Amino acid sequence: MKHNLIYGIILAIATLTATELSAQSSEGCDLHRTRLIPYPTANEAVEHSLAKQRYMQPITEWVTDSEGLLTGEFTYPFSWVERQIFVRVEGVGVPYEVLVNGKVAGSSTNGHAAAEYNITKISREDKNSLAIRLLDSGSVAPIENFEKGDAHPVAYVLSQPRVRVRDIFYRATIGKSGIVNVDLGAIMHNQTLGTKISRLYYEVYLNDTIRLGAGHRDVSLGMHGVDTMRFGVPVPDSVLWSSESPTRLSLRLKNRIAGRDVEFYNVPLALRELSYENGTFYINGKATTMDWAEVSPNATADIVKSLYERGHRAIRFTAGYVADETLSACDELGIYVAVTAPINSSKMGTSRKRGGNPSNNPRWRAEYVERVEQMIYTTQRHPSVVAYYLADDSANGICLYEAYLAAKRISGNRPVFYEDGNGEWNSDK
């Protein structure tokens, strides 16, 4: 009933002459990343729960009003003093604003991907209100002609130290004699006015019991400095991930600043070497045929499991929002995935002239590019994701050209496709 009420409000909001966002990307967002939850202890990190804990408070229950304002509450404890506070928003489904204690933290024109906002300066000790204002979707309607499910907005309020792990990445390269070289990296961010040194401890585990590698690295960061801490771990090729053997590892991190342990992580890893050459995918050096089954982005983890049981091993999610839990299910099962940015302008025709399809209108360029980049950054740690699609049925033009170039800069070894572009250059097929 609660979700139906929220969805009803969203549909009503779309017909109102309400506050309208210009379709020119978002404001106030922190850099996009795949979901990353800090924990206060190593044991809690290993449990990897999304339940409330000292450094994270989920908001899943909302008080709604008829004007499209969803309001929740979080507590700012004393232990968060001298730390940064972020809110990660997922699954809204329409353009929205984020407000903390009545002050705007930021906004997004793309309600179909996760976004984070730094709310440190507008939060206060003790009780705080957090609101999501649903905005008129008319501004983005020309590029959102795709299936939308019920809205399930979730907000995670996160506390991180002022010298923090901003993101994590990894890459596997098959070497000689059955050894795989794993390149791990943590992007560190100093959000203080002085130079700080972080010591980052790392461990790589198989089945949470067999330690494959461990060590630590130090990095000195100047005022507001950002640097990447890299470390390598050799592992046997028997732990490589594939559809036939979806082996998963875990990366455990501990961030120590001035002798104090300030955040812990337990990040799922799945190692596979990916390449795409002359129309063929190679997984761990083996040519792999992708017999894509087109699936709604609203598919749940249970639907994915059902597809797996029916023999599907490659899924192409059409344009829209794919929940992190759904992609995690694909990781666990060994399903290859292609995700599509939330862009479909099929109702706007194919003309490239003024007033035609938005894909050739420079006014939409920033929106297209951000949606594609956001898709990549928020899914890139999922090993199941082996390809990206720019859009569905959206003609072609300058916006998709620029989106393709942006995607190629950050997609790594994953190919970028666009099948509806009449064979133009902005597709790896």
Residue ranges of model-derived segments:
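Bacterial Sec-dependent N-terminal signal peptides
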Residues: 1-25
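Accessory beta-strand-rich segments of carbohydrate-active enzymes
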Residues: 25-46, 50, 65-167, 191, ...
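N-terminal carbohydrate-binding accessory modules
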Residues: 41-53, 168-169, 248-309, 328
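Coil residues (strongly favoring Ser/Thr
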Residues: 66, 137, 208-209, 227-228, ...
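Beta-strand-rich binding/interaction modules
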Residues: 98-100, 179-220, 227-231, 251
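Signal that preferentially marks extracellular ectodomain short beta-strand elements
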Residues: 117-121, 230-246
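Enriched for extracellular/lumenal, surface-exposed ectodomains of secreted and cell-surface proteins
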Residues: 133-140, 235-237, 252-258
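Substrate-binding/catalytic cleft of secreted carbohydrate-active enzymes
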Residues: 302, 314-429
